[in-house]
Amino acid sequence: MSILYIDEIKDLREKLVFIRVDFNVPQDDNGNITEDTRIVGAVPTIKYAIENGAKVILASHLGRPKGEKKPKYTMAPAARRLSELLGKEVKQATDCFGPDVDAMVAALQPGDVLMLENVRFYPGEEKNDPDFACKLANGCEIYVNDAFAVSHRAHASVHAITKCIPVIAAGFLMKNEMTFFEKAMTRPVRPLAAILGGAKVSGKLEVLETLVGKVDIIIIGGGMAFTFLKARGLSVGKSLVEDDLIDTAKRILDNAAKRGIEFLLPEDCVVADRFAADADCKTVSVNDIPSEWMALDVGPASTARFSDALKEANTVIWNGPMGVFEMDRFAKGTFAIADVVAGLKNATTIIGGGDTDSAVRKAGVADKVSYISTGGGAFLELLEGKKLPGVEVLEQSGK
């Protein structure tokens, strides 16, 4: 892998630097940002650029405005939050290009920062339109991708734009993402354990197929576990099951067994009579799930067994919660695993995916894991062994 990083560029002074960030952060109904991890994550790259005298243009998307200018998806709240984090004004453009934007760019001084409006206000962004990309580039001399979480998309501000700007580089957030992933998957200190949770097998099918050939321990929790348990012949009541993937689950289990991989499924679970925070619930063996009840969390025997396996690991990757952690009564399994992972002092522990990130933060142990990836889909695609379009163009430019 040969990628040029921003700190390897000899001179940024007075250069017009376009930084693609990912400020696609959650907001409440009043437009207040409720979780700013991705903005915080981009600060080191932005600070480096302005401290070295660059004129910085930032671009991001927010939500899914579907190629239309919708006020609720404005980048203004993100620009305000970034101003607070940087301790300096971040100028806010009302568009992505055009005469007004040109005037703001022309007025930039070394160390200034200009935030463009939401790039997805234009259909050309998601179409990877080269004309739109070059309008965004707007005479910039250096392009920096610091948006790992969107680098699995061949979109104009991530992919096509690299043909419009002469120098192409990656930022520090991107560097961290790729470094930790390579450490975990390319040259891991073994045993290597993967924890996969979440609702459906279908969303992580390719990941599972790939991991069976790479890891030493696989732990399955969340709704997806019950497709595997049914594949093993158990009755799982009203629990979430993808019946069309039963044969696939059997094949994955067989492959894991042939390779000598420790493949752990829940032994017990917390079941409820309905999907609700105030439902009646109880803990039962996975062999005794009532026919009209559904499993919404893993039980204490499962977390104890998972914990024992994880204590043997030197590298851990976790994607997906163990249960419906948004409801307090079904969060114990997820939080228990979070505590175990956080307690692995001598292991490299990597958290990937929005729900897992939220769970680790809610459990209060975010500062005790090695790395929390900002990418959901991008992280999964790397686990699947896929090349990310946004990373591929960086590799090509770095050669």
UniProtKB/Swiss-Prot annotation:
Record keywords, A-Z: ATP-binding, Cytoplasm, Glycolysis, Kinase, Nucleotide-binding, Transferase
Domain of life: Bacteria
Subcellular location: Cytoplasm
One Pfam family linked to the record: PGK
Biological pathway: Carbohydrate degradation; glycolysis; pyruvate from D-glyceraldehyde 3-phosphate: step 2/5
Biological processes per GO annotation: gluconeogenesis; glycolytic process
Matching InterPro entries: Phosphoglycerate_kinase (IPR001576), Phosphoglycerate_kinase_N (IPR015824), Phosphoglycerate_kinase_sf (IPR036043)
Documented EC number(s): 2.7.2.3
Keyword Hydrolase assigned: no
Reactions that this protein is recorded to catalyse: (2R)-3-phosphoglycerate + ATP = (2R)-3-phospho-glyceroyl phosphate + ADP
The protein's enzyme class: transferase
GO cellular component term, pick one: cytosol
Annotated residues for binding of substrate: D22, F23, N24, R38, H61, L62, G63, R64, R120, R153
Record-listed ATP binding positions: K204, E326, G353, G354, D355, T356
Gene Ontology molecular function: ADP binding; ATP binding; phosphoglycerate kinase activity
Record text on subunit structure and interactions: Monomer.
Family statement: Belongs to the phosphoglycerate kinase family.
The protein, known as: Phosphoglycerate kinase
Source organism per UniProt: Geotalea daltonii (strain DSM 22248 / JCM 15807 / FRC-32)
